[in-house]
Amino acid sequence: MNKDITKEKELYFELYELYKNRLKTKHLTLEAFRFERESASQLAWAAHNIANGKWEVNGYFPFNVYHPNRVINAPFYQDRIVEQWFVEKYIQPVFKPKLHEYNMACQSGKGPFLAMDYVKAAMEEMYYMYGDQWYVFQYDIEGYFDNISHKAAKKIMKRIGKEGYAIYEKIVDSFCIRDGYAALEDPENPNGYGYPKGTLPSQWTGIILLDALNWQIQDAPG
């Protein structure tokens, strides 16, 4: 019992430290303000459930964003804290050091502006070497997050260890897209595809599953 209590306390302080740091960098929305009033009990309850293997995603609330048009399914505030803690504790230490150096998403010190700098430098080099006798290949995967295979995601995430994987399994199975092309092609497993856009676990799952393609493009440029 003392061991369980100690683990629960450690989890609480980990969540609390992350929450304090989050307040320094995030705008205080109405949802965040309401959470702050009950933050101690909310974080204690989350820590208790994680320690006992009973934590579950509380659900998502959808909203539309534009340019490009898409639906974001955001987790509730407590879940956002837990999922950020989970990503930083379990996913990033395992996968971040192995990502291709030109993978710019979800990583401190990188992002779209650094990506544009790399693209600009590459284009300048191509102009210098070949004039205008070259081309740029830009691609997008249609419906990528809506059609991510839960099975494939779980397989690669087993690398994070048993404790982290138990949490990840609950996250990935908390959401599905039944009318995506992947689910429609697999009618016996309609709940096995799709990941909510806009969550940290989904973003990291997305870049990890595609990272092999980055290396393939580098190693076989022709």
Predicted region positions:
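Non-catalytic, polymerase-adjacent accessory regions of viral genome-replication enzymes
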Residues: 1-49
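Glycine-/proline-rich flexible loop or hinge segments
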Residues: 21-33, 63-73, 100-102
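Non-catalytic, well-ordered alpha-helical scaffold segments
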Residues: 40, 44, 79-84, 88, ...
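Reverse-transcriptase-like RNA-dependent polymerase core
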Residues: 46-68, 81, 167-185
